[in-house]
Amino acid sequence: MLEQVRGPADLQHLSQSQLRDLAQEIRQFLIHKVAATGGHLGPNLGVVELTLALHRVFDSPHDPIIFDTGHQAYVHKMLTGRSEDFDTLRSKDGLSGYPSRSESDHDWVESSHASAALSYADGLAKAFELTGHRNRHVVAVVGDGALTGGMCWEALNNIATSRRPVVIVVNDNGRSYAPTIGGLAEHLAALRLQPGYERVLEEGRKAVRGVPLIGELCYQCIHSIKAGIKDAIAPQVMFTDLGIKYVGPIDGHDEHAVESALRHARGFNAPVIVHVVTRKGMGYAPAENDEADQMHACGVIDPETGLPTKASGTSWTSVFSDELISQAAKRRDVVAITAAMPGPTGLSAFRDRFPDRFFDVGIAEQHAMTSAAGLAMGGLHPVVAIYSTFLNRAFDQLMMDVALHKLPVTMVLDRAGITGPDGASHNGMWDLSILGIIPGIRVAAPRDGARLRAELGEALAVNDGPTAIRFPKGDVGEDIPAVQRRDGVDVLAVPATGLTHDVLLVAVGSFAKMALAVAELLRSQGIGVTVVDPRWVLPVPEALADLARDHKLVVTVEDNGLHGGIGSSVSAALRHAEIDVPCRDVGVPQQFQDHASRGEVLAEVGLTDRHIARQITGWVAAIGTRSAAEDEVGQTLD
């Protein structure tokens, strides 16, 4: 049946029985396709019936359907004519793992960072009103904890003041949403703080419990009824107090019920919340039984068991996780913060070992950073573990709430540099540029696991300002020893005997291995190369300037955007030190990179050992030619 669905129009004639069969077919399709490519499996298994209902009720793309977050959009892609492309999911030139405007008119937003859909919806609804398209609805599907982000509530505050037809579907899969909503609970909490409330409540408890034989039972019944009423109506009160109509809760796996609720909501022609309760990983036992995250995201797996098809090596994340626990065991002031990602950022083990010193703030990076500032003010040393790409969201808080106060907060930036399959929104290629303008910050880029352990300890020893440590996604590889240490800078290789000090090659973090390969290629061409790892890349170590004096050319290699990266900082440092040595930087072009494997993206932007060696060979030749020409001019003048 799925093969016959080329677009939403093909869903309109299906009976409820056929829709149930189609839902089952979609789940089997998802399991086998995502098992082969990797991707976000659990979230999409949970929204099958919901997505079917959305496309039967609303006229996409005339009525925009915006997914927050975009990793819930696989079924949407299938129902809009892209099923045949799923073998290429998250592959180079293939189907994106998120909505993609270049793929389909049905994808309005390339949404992958959470909590933004309602703001898009608010803007679109305003635009449709102003341009006379009042018959168009805007649908925002919010789930997977996105409502824990403050931006959602900022948008709701604006949406609620209008009569524009915005339908907000809350996909409540029990992953962070429910505990964050409860208007009546807040009112009751305020009431409990009023003088006399506790006294009257306690007298009432005593009176009921004092009834012979049945008193305690009566009290428990009344207490349960009160709690049930509070839980049942708290969501409605929260939203209706804002001025937004509320429909639900609805069984999200009953397509007919969801469709009826959506049609009802569509008829309001005003802002409305449709509360849909779903189960993440629905219909796939390995996902349903995965207590950690219902197989939120997976690599290549066996579809029958849900287990990875091949063992992975030691990851950067796991090295950080182990070392943080080791440090925390020695230092009671070390605390950890995550923005709804304890597993992916390596903090699950810390949470289990030190539950009182672990804080999951939800999808709230801004709050995470300023909360960390408060923890630091109180005498603790917070470690904020976050994906590099999500650091962008907390820039102001880092600048004004942490750095301005010179607070000892350590940020651990996972997935730094090119990550690959998740595409432009998840590449961590801006963090060095962002951090480079923060006064007083110290930034480390470890080249291997041993350096990650050492630099985490060094960061925790800093008590007069913020620190950051960045590392990439994937396996950490073998340790790379230094041949010598120069005032904190590790020298990894020196020119072979008989070669001059032609090039100082500055390797940033995990690019040290590639830099050594580049040096070997250049050695075979008679070019002498010194390879160094600054370890702490910001501020630029003074020893790096001293090393530069002895070379004809300085080249930096980094997996950050060229604009404002370490190359720019090194060039500025050499100018400041009045060292007149040419400096060239190699990094990621200042443009969004499409999804592909990390290796494919690096090759496409020229970040391979052979390409870099060719570049350096050309630069060295140009410097030699220029020097010869200058000598010739000098002789002529003499």
Swiss-Prot record:
Cross-referenced SMART domains: Transket_pyr
Ranges in a coiled coil: none
Pfam families per UniProt: DXP_synthase_N (PF13292), Transket_pyr (PF02779), Transketolase_C (PF02780)
GO biological process assignments: 1-deoxy-D-xylulose 5-phosphate biosynthetic process; isopentenyl diphosphate biosynthetic process, methylerythritol 4-phosphate pathway; terpenoid biosynthetic process; thiamine biosynthetic process
Catalysed reaction equations from the record: D-glyceraldehyde 3-phosphate + pyruvate + H(+) = 1-deoxy-D-xylulose 5-phosphate + CO2
A GO CC term assigned to this protein in UniProt: cytosol
Disulfide bonds: none
Record: residues binding thiamine diphosphate: H71, S112, H113, A114, G145, A146, N173, Y284, E365
Chain positions recorded as Mg(2+) binding sites: D144, N173
Enzyme class: transferase
Domain of life (superkingdom): Bacteria
Transferase in keyword set: yes
GO MF entries: 1-deoxy-D-xylulose-5-phosphate synthase activity; magnesium ion binding; thiamine pyrophosphate binding
Cofactor(s) in the UniProt record: Mg(2+); thiamine diphosphate
CDD domains: TPP_DXS, TPP_PYR_DXS_TK_like
Family: Belongs to the transketolase family. DXPS subfamily.
Quaternary structure (record): Homodimer.
Name of protein: 1-deoxy-D-xylulose-5-phosphate synthase
Source organism of this protein record: Mycolicibacterium smegmatis (strain ATCC 700084 / mc(2)155) (Mycobacterium smegmatis)
